[in-house]
């Protein structure tokens, strides 16, 4: 039963976690409870409301100072428009994970990406442990008793099971009582059905009240300076759409996960980019707007008006998408929301993960003690988790392990301040919001939007498909434009000699390998039985061998493809051009290799690293409060640092598209000299001396560096 006591704030958020991990509401829970004693009144529109005026092109309600920093390469933007117009989910996914979707196009791109996302096609959500326990208990009770105990969980025994139990218990009675028993069974079934329906209605009403309450908390979170906020007509319609979407999802998936406040926050954060009301531009403002803002909603084009006005005919194109599109995407908010939850809360199926781990050293673990088995399991998880993903408990443990390894100073300070040690109460729930709910509620909408782009664009390469297949799916994209997207952010490099001698020769010709070869090869032969060592090598080789698919083309081929629209002949010429005297780097189509939720761990570490200087100056309470409401990574330069705004803008953009293999300087002049191209970068910054830089692309790039640093350190320890 969903509790409605004073502690319901914490119970509603702890239902989808293990017993040792709690994600209750943040430290403002007491304020929320006091200010929102009657949530219904907060969401009910008044009898007379001020109509919301459409925002015109010249409207300056959103000042330049409050507009987010945004720069985007014009070629990539036009390519994104081309893929959007043709509903090319292959191309849109590529841009989403490599560069990010332009925020003004997310409302049309996200539905397309979600429809084809692997986690939506094959969904799996980690079931709540409470539901599993209650379901098991209800089944055992129904088999041992002829009467129902009135289980209140979404998973309950059917009336048929209860009826069968009653018949079995009454099987020893006289035949003369059969008619009476049948009548009693019918009466009991009728009573059970009506009782169950009434019980379900009560549960649904309780869930709906919790949803209303959590929606009201969002208003209070934004309008904390106002004791009472009047919800307008359009705002009320949006909140009603959100409420119905959350309710339908809960009813559909209630047998797997209970309602949790995170479900409401996911809907609220989605509504910050995707207009809930069809054919309108209204989205929720997000926490970046001041509490004095006149409304909870805003025209999402206003934030990027400078960028829009710098591109001819872009505003007209966007208005056609908003008000007149019937072809590209007409999916409802409820459908987008359901699919988004399936992606954000996805968890790998236990059987598939167990098979992969059991295949490595199964015979060696058989005769070990229980303690050794647990230790060995952790070693194997470190090598399988990056590719397969894991439960939230495993990801939290992995996060803490990587934090200690990659950011030891901050980890030590967290240890001194007792951060990451109190998952049983309200203290460290921020980490669950970061990792399990993918930044919902606690991150800036602009940072979260870019990170969600990355997760929605996550795609694995089909090993049965070759380069020509994917290049055709990308509509033979121009080589220079493809180069701007760079390699997979979480790329890794393996040693080709190790691939040959380590993978092929060890098993078949281990005794014939020359001892004078590389030391690493000798170590691998001597320690062939060491699961930890061989598995890490296998992980690196597997990631590097299938990192991307590519074709090697000659310089002439590059000139041909870049000077005109790419054609199928470009890839056909590739094999014959391999003998040319002048060979350029491969044409690469990057694909994802690391599980998106594991990648999110390194993105979270990168965010912590960027805030390290701030965090070490805060005390325990301030750290938790800060991490529960992380400020945006967009900020304004001081006046003394505005002497080179163009250089900084170029650097910020280049860092998000650089394909430098070793994480060199964001500005890669060599690449520009090899692939001459006009880098036209449009900015959303105002034309005055104030200049802002958005670091979220740098944060994601740094996450890739942390990933390679961790992988390298593990390999060094193995040797």
Swiss-Prot record:
Entry GO CC: cytoplasm
Domain Rab-GAP TBC, residue spans: 100-459
Main location: cytoplasm
Keyword Cytoplasm on entry: yes
Residue ranges, compositional bias (Low complexity): 1-22, 135-159, 169-182, 648-660
Biased composition (Polar residues): 374-386
Subcellular localization, as worded in the UniProt entry: Cytoplasm
Region Disordered, annotated ranges: 1-66, 132-205, 351-386, 558-588, 637-674
Keyword set, alphabetical order: Cytoplasm
Name of the protein: Oxidant-induced cell-cycle arrest protein 5
Organism: Candida dubliniensis (strain CD36 / ATCC MYA-646 / CBS 7987 / NCPF 3949 / NRRL Y-17841) (Yeast)
Organism phylogeny: Eukaryota, Fungi, Dikarya, Ascomycota, Saccharomycotina
Encoding gene (name): OCA5
């Amino acid at each position: 039963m969903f509790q409605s006591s004073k502690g319901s704030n914490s119970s509603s958020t702890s239902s989808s976690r293990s017993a040792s991990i709690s994600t209750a509401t943040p430290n403002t829970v007491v304020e929320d409870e006091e200010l929102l004693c009657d949530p219904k009144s907060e969401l009910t529109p008044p009898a007379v409301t001020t109509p919301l005026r459409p925002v015109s092109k010249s409207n300056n309600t959103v000042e330049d100072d409050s507009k987010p920093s945004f720069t985007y390469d014009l070629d990539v933007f036009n390519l994104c428009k081309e893929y959007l117009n043709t509903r090319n989910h292959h191309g849109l996914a590529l841009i989403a994970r490599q560069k990010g979707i332009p925020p003004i196009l997310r409302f049309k791109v996200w539905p397309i990406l979600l429809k084809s996302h692997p986690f939506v096609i094959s969904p799996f959500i980690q079931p709540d442990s409470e539901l599993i326990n209650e379901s098991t208990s209800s089944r055992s009770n129904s088999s041992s008793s002829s009467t129902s105990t009135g289980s209140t969980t979404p998973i309950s025994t059917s009336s048929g099971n209860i009826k069968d139990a009653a018949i079995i218990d009454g099987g020893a009675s006289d035949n003369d009582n059969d008619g009476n028993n049948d009548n009693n069974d019918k009466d009991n079934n009728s009573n059970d059905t009506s009782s169950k329906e009434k019980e379900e209605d009560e549960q649904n009403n309780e869930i709906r009240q919790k949803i209303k309450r959590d929606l009201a908390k969002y208003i209070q979170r934004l309008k904390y300076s106002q004791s009472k906020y009047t919800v307008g007509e359009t705002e009320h319609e949006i909140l009603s759409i959100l409420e119905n979407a959350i309710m339908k999802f809960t009813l559909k998936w209630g047998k797997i996960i209970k309602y949790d406040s995170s479900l409401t926050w996911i809907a609220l954060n989605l509504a910050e980019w995707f207009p809930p009301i069809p054919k309108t531009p209204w989205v929720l403002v997000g926490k970046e707007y001041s509490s004095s803002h006149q409304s909870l909603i805003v025209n999402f084009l206003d934030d990027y008006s400078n960028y829009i006005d710098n591109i001819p005919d872009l505003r007209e194109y966007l208005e056609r998408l908003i008000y007149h599109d019937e072809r590209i995407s007409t999916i409802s908010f409820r459908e987008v929301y359901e699919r988004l939850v399936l992606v954000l809360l996805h968890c790998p199926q236990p059987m598939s993960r167990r098979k992969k781990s059991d295949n490595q050293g199964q015979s060696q673990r058989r005769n070990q003690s229980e303690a050794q088995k647990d230790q060995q399991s952790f070693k194997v998880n470190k090598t399988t988790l990056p590719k397969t993903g894991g439960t939230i408990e495993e990801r939290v443990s992995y996060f803490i392990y990587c934090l200690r390894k990659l950011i030891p100073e901050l980890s030590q300070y967290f240890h001194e301040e007792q951060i990451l040690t109190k998952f049983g109460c309200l203290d460290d729930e921020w980490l669950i919001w970061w990792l399990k709910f993918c930044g919902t509620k606690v991150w800036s909408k602009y940072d979260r939007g870019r990170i969600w782009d990355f997760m929605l664009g996550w795609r694995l390469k089909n090993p049965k498909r070759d380069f020509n297949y994917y290049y055709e799916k990308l509509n033979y994209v121009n080589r220079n434009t493809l180069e701007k997207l760079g390699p997979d952010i979480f790329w890794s490099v393996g040693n080709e000699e190790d691939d040959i001698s380590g993978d092929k020769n060890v098993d078949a010709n281990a005794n014939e390998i020359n001892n004078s070869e590389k030391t690493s090869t000798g170590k691998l032969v001597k320690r062939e039985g060491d699961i930890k060592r061989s598995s890490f090598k296998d992980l690196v080789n597997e990631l590097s061998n299938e990192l991307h698919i590519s074709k090697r083309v000659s310089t002439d081929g590059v000139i041909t493809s870049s000077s005109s629209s790419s054609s199928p002949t470009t890839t056909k010429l590739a094999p014959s051009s391999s003998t040319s005297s002048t060979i350029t780097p491969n044409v690469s189509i990057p694909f994802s290799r690391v599980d998106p939720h594991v990648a999110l761990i390194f993105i979270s570490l990168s965010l912590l690293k960027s805030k390290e200087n701030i965090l070490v100056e805060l005390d325990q309470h301030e750290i938790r409060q800060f991490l529960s409401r992380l400020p945006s990574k967009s900020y304004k330069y001081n006046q003394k640092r505005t002497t080179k705004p163009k250089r900084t803008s170029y650097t910020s953009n280049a860092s998000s598209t650089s394909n430098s293999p070793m994480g060199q300087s964001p500005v890669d002049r060599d690449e520009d000299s090899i692939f001459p191209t006009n880098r036209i970068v449009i900015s959303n910054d105002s034309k005055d001396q104030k200049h802002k830089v958005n670091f979220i692309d740098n944060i994601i790039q740094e996450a890739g560096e942390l990933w390679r640093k961790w992988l390298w350190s593990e390999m060094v320890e193995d040797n």
